[in-house]
Amino acid sequence: MEILEEKPKEGKVKIKVETLDDLWHLYHIITPGDVVYAKTLRKQSQRSDSLRPEKVEVIPVFLGVKVEKINFHKFANQLRVTGPIIYASREDVPLGKYHTIAVEPGTIITLQKERWKPYYIERLKEAVEASKRAKVMIVTIEDGEAEMAIVREYGLDFIATIRHNLGGKRYNIKREDEERKFFHDVAKTMKDVMSRENIQRAIVAGPGFYKEDFYKFLKENYPDLASKIVLDDTSMGGRVGIYEVIKRGTVDKVYSESRIANEIKLVEKVIERIAKDEPVAYGMKEVEEAVNYGAVEILLVLDELLKGDNREKVEELMELARSLRSKVVVVSSEHEGGEKLKALGGIAGILRFKIK
């Protein structure tokens, strides 16, 4: 994400969207009541005369839309912002009609808020910083099966599963041929994804020595790819193995500021404190009480709460926590840490001291 222009007095920020992660950040920054300005395409009906049917023309136009709905479509690489038109660069576009602006990587938008609350300013800065960090890919590999995921800002994006039937015994010639085909398939997919997504590092993990065999194959056949690989041990392959890599902290070693690893670690710390009866609070009532006591060291808030009916109450609690020197972390609902936090009511606090 790139900030092109800021107009604080008007509450406007001009933004260039660059990645899927930027769309996810914007999904949590744009709220109902905001105004989004962008170049867009709009269908316009034209009647040439009363005897002929209406002709629909698609016209390019610069619109301002007052936001009512925001939808993040990660598989379509798109954020859809819907609301009534309050500004149009063409006089033949009627104000008040509804329009959806499709925001994609490459789109330039101007976002206007009546008030930029601290959370939204922090989130915007975080998105800009995140765009400067290298992305990491995780691949788990074992006997004829590979699973691939990209570590994104919002969680893990599982992008490919490759399976080959390798046949019989390990040193059978036919099996060795099939294994080479499998390795080539995995390597080519990795190269394609890393090139397309501009990924500089990949973690290859799995149980046993199979990953070492694959790494040796890469050094002989794909040396450029091999130079970007870090190996890691896991007890299992597949998606379970990928989550194991996250929990082991390997991503942090490769990519020192992994958002997802930090969020999962903090949620696990909450669960550990609950089990050990150490200072912790979870659920809205308990956490609100802890914040009012100034007892919260780290406040964890599930991102879904900032899209729900109690959004304003949650935002006020976050602002109060910050004013009392608490660190506030918004946890993505797209990974297992978010799922666990959701089971605790979507909000939790790691406390400085017990309040009961």
Curated annotation (Swiss-Prot):
UniProt-listed Pfam families: eRF1_1, eRF1_2, eRF1_3
CC per GO annotation: cytoplasm
Family annotation (Gene3D superfamilies): 3.30.1330.30, eRF1 domain 2, Pelota, domain A
Location within or outside the cell: Cytoplasm
Enzyme's top EC category: hydrolase
GO terms assigned for molecular function: endonuclease activity; metal ion binding
Top-rank taxon: Archaea
Assembly mode: Monomer.
Family: Belongs to the eukaryotic release factor 1 family. Pelota subfamily.
Identification of the protein by name: Protein pelota homolog
Protein's organism: Pyrococcus horikoshii (strain ATCC 700860 / DSM 12428 / JCM 9974 / NBRC 100139 / OT-3)
Gene encoding the protein: pelA
